[in-house]
Amino acid sequence: MAKEKFERNKPHVNVGTIGHVDHGKTTLTAALTRVCSEVFGSARVDFDKIDSAPEEKARGITINTAHVEYDSNIRHYAHVDCPGHADYVKNMITGAAQMDGAILVCSAADGPMPQTREHILLSRQVGVPYIVVFLNKADMVDDAELLELVEMEVRDLLSTYDFPGDDTPIIIGSALMALNGEDTNELGTSAVKKLVETLDTYIPEPVRAIDRPFLMPIEDVFSISGRGTVVTGRVERGIVKIQEEIEIVGLRPTTKTTCTGVEMFRKLLDEGRAGENCGVLLRGTKRDEVERGQVLAKPGTIKPHTKFEAEVYVLSKEEGGRHTPFFKGYRPQFYFRTTDVTGSCELPEGVEMVMPGDNIKMVVTLIKPIAMEDGLRFAIREGGRTVGAGVVAKIIE
């Protein structure tokens, strides 16, 4: 069979299911592919195939994730579903599958449970911008008051973690009914259709990397006689054009310079775009004034910081991480984009030690500033070996 052509005509949005174990995340994922295949003509994926998610590695961490795709009238959705709670934690912290919005699945029969809370907290920490709620298993609840109660609990929980609980769309339905093609009381197919329409309207179209302000992590620095200093790297976002003023941020005091040339595969270009590996020629900058680990950026768009709150996952022994716990005063290297910087960890009150396999909130103080913003991912290393993964949740100074 010929490979299907990838249609690029609809905006692409990344979503995923989150919520407590056995509340119906995978069933809903399968139901979404079924309903969308019938209504909008995308391919359906069976429950078993999603449930036996393949292992993948992200930054040396093994994560089980299922990826499915479906279409609405106006969008193409890429959807991630994880079989186990630990997979969610790793997935969200490493940013292996970044979400533009999440579908929180909560069983109407059970109400919010510990992982419901933890996934909402993680979404806040790692910067998932929007959450839509699907109150599942509603066919098992006869009491309308009970449904209202669960809905109120979920809204309160969202508000606790700074999501707009009162304005969050909540769809009531049964994923299993939709998966079986049933629709009693509009709880099956209709509810899932309504969910897709809600994703279309409630989650805004993400800003593409190319439309965001220019940023390029510096990987290497060369001096070309007669032409000046060239820094190379992969443009993370935005576009850099010749004669534009750019800032060099991180590790040292921020300096301004001008881009006097862009080259790619030894060809001269007039701009470098998101996703491209290129060399940028800097006017009047000396070879020893820039180094790996700094970034080039559009002036004023990113600042250097040393202290931040992070959400961290500590690799287990089986994943090649530490064999022993660490304690307060732990000083590993934090690997941001292209370089390691030493930093110290301050653990939350009442936490004495952190075990391999845990996830934890900590405050990190680096010995040198790094160009940083909320949502930036990093690795924690000891002597070049990765022992953890983290994300900047909040910048302190």
From Swiss-Prot:
It comes from Ectopseudomonas mendocina (strain ymp). GTP binds at residues 19-26, 81-85, 136-139. It catalyses: GTP + H2O = GDP + phosphate + H(+). It is found in: Cytoplasm. Mg(2+) binds at T26. Residues 60-64 are annotated as: G2. The keyword Protein biosynthesis applies. Its EC number is 3.6.5.3. This is Elongation factor Tu. It comes from the Bacteria. Residues 19-26 are annotated as: G1. GO terms for cellular component: cytosol. The lineage of its organism: Bacteria, Pseudomonadati, Pseudomonadota, Gammaproteobacteria, Pseudomonadales. It is an enzyme of class 3 (hydrolase). Residues 136-139 are annotated as: G4. Belongs to the TRAFAC class translation factor GTPase superfamily. Classic translation factor GTPase family. EF-Tu/EF-1A subfamily. Keywords: Cytoplasm, Elongation factor, GTP-binding, Hydrolase, Magnesium, Metal-binding, Nucleotide-binding, Protein biosynthesis.
